Structure formats: structure tokens, C-alpha cells
Amino acid sequence: MPKLTPTERGIAIYNPLVLQIYDYWVLNIVNTWAWRCPTKTHLLPLFVSNIGSNHLDIGVGTGYYLANGTIPQTTRLTLCDLSPTAMAKAKARAGREDARELLCDVLKPLPVRAGEKFDSVSMYFLLHCLPGPVGNKICVFEHVKGVLKEDGVVTGATVLGKGVKDNFFGGLIRRFCVYDGIMSNETDDVESFVEALKANFEVVEVDVIGVVLVFKAMKPKL
């Protein structure tokens, strides 16, 4: 059997069984006790308060945010992910048959319609899953900038791997996730992400909660 690339390995992890338990295990237990950034306290409210009329969700996971974010039916919804399994799960949970699917790699320019711009973009727990060092990932912000309206907003969160201190449980989870290829964030630090955000957006707000970088950016630079 040929060896999987880091990207293929990351996609393979999100099989139906993992997606079945992801919300309870990751978004409830791990986020609260390992990463110390409870989903319902910090991440879901940020998502809910920043949904525009034309929204792009990158790295859809199980569709938790789409299902719990009270997105108006009038909102145009586009889902972007590299995993067909995750995409199908998220679309079903969103309850939006009209949601558009973009099966693509966010490390490459997003294959949206020519001239298409979004009011809002979300990327929760995406960056720490992308393969390679942090320098390989920051191009994502440039790609997002290119599809965001002048008055649009992008929000997200990622588990940092450098410059933060784990508790015992967090250390165990981190070592397992890195070893198993679930996360690739050993060089991911606040400074690199903030620098990349500020290079692409005029307004940048960040906070480190536990070991999670939570961010919001507006006014894409020309």
C-alpha cells in the first residue's frame, strides 16, 4: 500500500466513526479540559455573531457550527473542505440542500466564481490540521482576503503548538494528535499568525484562550 501524504492522512482521519463522536469528544471534552477554550463559551458565540448574508465556512468538520449557529435561511451558504465525508456530514447537519460545496485544498487559491465575494468567512480548528510548518499555512489568509467583501469579516480559532503551556491532559492529547497526523502545529505560534493576519487585513483582533488562538479580521488590504 502506498504511503499517504500528510494531506491525505489528515483527510482519512475524518471517517464516519470519528465524525460520529467528534462533537462530544473534541468540542466538549477536549476543548474544555485539554485546550481550555470551551466551545459554547467562546467559539460558538463568535461564529454566531459574525454570519453575513453570503457565508463561506472553510474546514467544515462535522457541521457543528452550521447546525448550532442559527444561520438564517436567507443566508447563502458555501462549504469548503477537502474531505467528501466531512462535507456530506456538515451539509446534512446544516439542513441546507441549497448549500454550495467546494471540494478543495485551502492551501491553494479558492475555486470560487469569478469576482465572487463573501460577507463572512469562518475557519474553526482548520489551521492546526494543515500539514507543514506555520510558514506553509499563512497563505490561507491571503486566499481568504481575495474572496472577502470590503466590509466583510473572517473569524476562526486554532490550537497553538508553540509559546503556550499545556496541562497534563492537554499534553497527552497533543502528543497523540501530532503522532497520529491529526494535527501538525508544532511551529504554530501567535506571532506568525498575527503577522500574517495584519499583512492581509486592516483590522485584526486576537485572543489566546488556554492554548487556542481566537481571531477576527476585517477590511481586507488591497
UniProtKB/Swiss-Prot annotation:
Under what name is this protein listed? Answer: Physcion biosynthesis cluster O-methyltransferase
Q: Which InterPro entries does the record match to this protein?
A: Methyltransf_12, MeTrfase_VrtF, SAM-dependent_MTases_sf
Q: Which family does it belong to?
A: Belongs to the methyltransferase superfamily.
Keyword S-adenosyl-L-methionine part of the UniProt annotation: yes
GO molecular function (one): methyltransferase activity
Q: Briefly, what is this protein's role?
A: O-methyltransferase; part of the gene cluster that mediates the biosynthesis of physcion, a natural anthraquinone fungicide that can prevent plant fungal infections.
A biological-process GO annotation: methylation
